[in-house]
Amino acid sequence: MEAQKLSVEAIEKGTVIDHIPAGRGLTILRQFKLLHYGNAVTVGFNLPSKTQGSKDIIKIKGVCLDDKAADRLALFAPEAVVNTIDNFKVVQKRHLTLPDEIAEVFRCPNPNCAGHGEPVKSRFYVKKHNGQTRLKCHYCEKTYNRDSVAEA
């Protein structure tokens, strides 16, 4: 039997975001500014997956995501798993859950929203509706799909 080979190189210490839906890895890199840490980032796109068919994976050397940051990832990849790595071994495995509320991450797409011209922090309530993630602005109370808010 042939030894199993990793598609993306292992890291000694850091974070692995696994089981990202294929094609969403780049969005997560951009939205969470994962390239701004100054650490090595390894990305695999459209890798084979037994459960998903294909998946993306992100490995960030020397950076450990806290629970709050990990749960924000659920907006883009609810089935992703965040693994904390130490000495090349998984020391913590977190399955993501959608947060009830998210603050200071996105800007409201409504140009008339009070959150635009005022010194207030953005704040959205997160809901699942018909299988889609929806975000309701705390200030203008308009509801948007995840992609509309992410691109604003």
Swiss-Prot record:
Metal-binding as UniProt keyword: yes
Pfam families reported in the protein's UniProt record: PyrI, PyrI_C
Matches recorded under Gene3D superfamilies: Aspartate carbamoyltransferase regulatory subunit, C-terminal domain, Aspartate carbamoyltransferase regulatory subunit, N-terminal domain
Keywords attached to this entry: Metal-binding, Pyrimidine biosynthesis, Zinc
Binding of Zn(2+), residues: 108, 113, 137, 140
GO terms under cellular component: aspartate carbamoyltransferase complex
Needed cofactors: Zn(2+)
GO biological process, one term: 'de novo' pyrimidine nucleobase biosynthetic process
GO MF assignments: metal ion binding
SUPFAM superfamilies documented for this protein: Aspartate carbamoyltransferase, Regulatory-chain, C-terminal domain, Aspartate carbamoyltransferase, Regulatory-chain, N-terminal domain
Cofactor binding remark: Binds 1 zinc ion per subunit.
InterPro entries: Asp_carbamoyltransf_reg_N, Asp_carbamoylTrfase_reg, Asp_carbamoyltrfase_reg_C, Asp_carbatrfase_reg_C_sf, Asp_carbatrfase_reg_N_sf
Residue spans crossing the bilayer: none
Keyword Cell cycle assigned: no
PANTHER family named among the record's database cross-references: ASPARTATE CARBAMOYLTRANSFERASE REGULATORY CHAIN
Function: Involved in allosteric regulation of aspartate carbamoyltransferase.
Subunit organization: Contains catalytic and regulatory chains.
Family statement: Belongs to the PyrI family.
Protein name as annotated: Aspartate carbamoyltransferase regulatory chain
Natural source organism: Neisseria gonorrhoeae (strain ATCC 700825 / FA 1090)
